[in-house]
């Protein structure tokens, strides 16, 4: 079995893959254009940010699994992979700690004027800050928009800094908030009003909703801090640039959008660059050795489970619930041809099988099988299955 690795991985990880009995094609500089040629007889494809196009999917006749070394799967033609019966898996949240650490680094830099002081000292200028320019984080209130793995890592660090934490998320309940020692907010604007600092993290696949709009910003306290990491589409940049000046907000951001606005000279441009004391960085969020190692460990786990157990962990393109409306529940003799005969009767009845599951009992004499169907079998088909040699029992259940 061939594994094509189209991203940088340590030699130890490549050796682990080879120890699973695979032939590893290591092409860390592989482009999307060349991938189409190399993927033809590959069973497993590993990528980081390289585009996996519909053409690559079509060319991968032997392709069974695509693994994204990271969380964001926007670079993979998911619909086409699903149509060809190819599993797509990722390594979710292995970057959560790294993103939380950067978020706090940006908060501290905003509060203490780290960049300004470092720049002045580099020029030989001893620039002593005014008393009160840095407020300190202890005892302040942090509003966390969202409550996924990244935000929960931010909360852990906030508590270590003796910061009061508020949180809002569509999925957050008062009970979960209490268990996490944060105060529940029913609405984003409530969080904005009550916070001295606000953090926002938005991965690429969730960037279709603006979380920080003009209304949210107008509700923030004068002089508050806002740090956002991830895709910039989650923040109304024009509103932030305008309101930050009016309300003296301090802004820091790390952006990771694949296509960013540039000037005619090819340089990045943003309304936020002109804001006093604004801090902007590009794709620092997950770039730590700890995050890299966590991702490679998870990548190995995904491929190992697939090769050894036939199970795809972290799969992102399976239906949570199949379109099946009926289920056959059978006890069968564990002998050659019994299940095949059952399937033959289902086919003869013109019914499609959506899912099938089978288990064998101790002694390997009998098995238990469930077959999910897209419509109800005819009475004649059920009778024919019951009469098959090796069928011990049959029950038909409606799926609701």
State the predicted function of each range.
Residues 1-91, 213, 355-356, 360-366, ...:
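An N-terminal-biased, well-structured beta-alpha scaffold segment characteristic
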Residues 52-58, 171-268, 287, 399:
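Rossmann-like adenosine-cofactor binding region
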Residues 63, 138-141, 223:
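Phosphate-coordination loops involved in phosphoryl transfer and adenosine-cofactor binding
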Residues 84-86, 92-141, 153-156, 167, ...:
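Phosphate-binding beta-alpha-beta segment of Rossmann-like dinucleotide-binding domains, i.e.
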Residues 88, 222-324, 332-333, 368, ...:
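Rossmann-like dinucleotide-binding domain for NAD(H)/NADP(H)
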Residues 100-119, 156-163, 297-310, 343-352:
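Oxidoreductase and adenylate-handling cofactor-binding alpha/beta cores
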Residues 147-148:
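Glycine-rich Rossmann-fold phosphate-binding loop(s) that bind the pyrophosphate
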Residues 313-400:
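A conserved regulatory-domain signal marking ACT and ACT-like small-molecule sensing domains
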């Amino acid at each position: 079995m061939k594994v094509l690795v189209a991203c940088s991985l340590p030699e130890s990880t490549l050796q682990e893959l080879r120890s699973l009995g695979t032939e590893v094609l290591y092409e860390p500089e592989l482009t999307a254009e060349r991938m189409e040629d190399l993927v033809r007889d590959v069973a497993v494809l590993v990528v980081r940010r390289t585009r996996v196009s519909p053409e690559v999917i079509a060319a991968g006749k032997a392709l069974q699994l695509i693994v994204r070394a990271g969380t964001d799967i926007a670079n993979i033609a998911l619909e086409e992979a699903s149509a060809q019966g190819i599993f797509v898996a990722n390594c979710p949240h292995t970057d959560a700690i790294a993103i939380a650490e950067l978020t706090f680094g940006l908060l501290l830099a905003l509060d203490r004027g780290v960049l300004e002081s470092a720049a002045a000292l580099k020029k030989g200028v001893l620039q002593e800050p005014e008393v009160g320019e840095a407020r300190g984080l202890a005892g302040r209130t942090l509003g966390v928009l969202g409550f996924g793995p990244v935000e929960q890592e931010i909360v852990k660090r906030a508590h270590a800094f003796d910061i009061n934490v508020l949180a809002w998320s569509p999925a957050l309940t008062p009970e979960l908030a209490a268990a996490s020692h944060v105060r529940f907010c029913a609405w984003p604007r409530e969080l904005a009003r009550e916070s001295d600092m606000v953090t926002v993290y938005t991965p690429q696949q969730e960037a279709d909703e603006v979380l920080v709009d003009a209304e949210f910003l107008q509700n923030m306290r004068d002089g508050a801090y806002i740090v956002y990491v991830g895709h910039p589409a989650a923040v109304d940049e024009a509103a932030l640039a305008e309101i930050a000046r009016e309300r003296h907000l301090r802004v820091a951001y790390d952006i990771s959008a694949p296509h960013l606005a540039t000037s005619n000279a090819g340089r990045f441009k943003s309304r936020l660059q002109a804001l006093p004391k604004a801090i902007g960085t590009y794709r620092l969020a997950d770039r730590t050795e700890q995050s890299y190692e966590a991702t490679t460990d998870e990548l190995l786990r995904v491929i190992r489970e697939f090769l050894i157990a036939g199970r795809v962990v972290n799969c992102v393109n399976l239906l949570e619930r199949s379109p099946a409306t009926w289920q056959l529940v059978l006890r069968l003799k564990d002998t050659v041809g019994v299940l095949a005969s059952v399937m033959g009767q289902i086919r003869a009845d013109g019914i499609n099988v959506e899912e099938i599951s089978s288990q064998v009992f101790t002694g390997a004499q009998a098995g238990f099988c469930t077959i999910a169907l897209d419509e109800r079998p005819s009475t004649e088909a059920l009778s024919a299955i019951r009469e098959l040699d090796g069928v011990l029992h049959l029950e038909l259940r409606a799926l609701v």
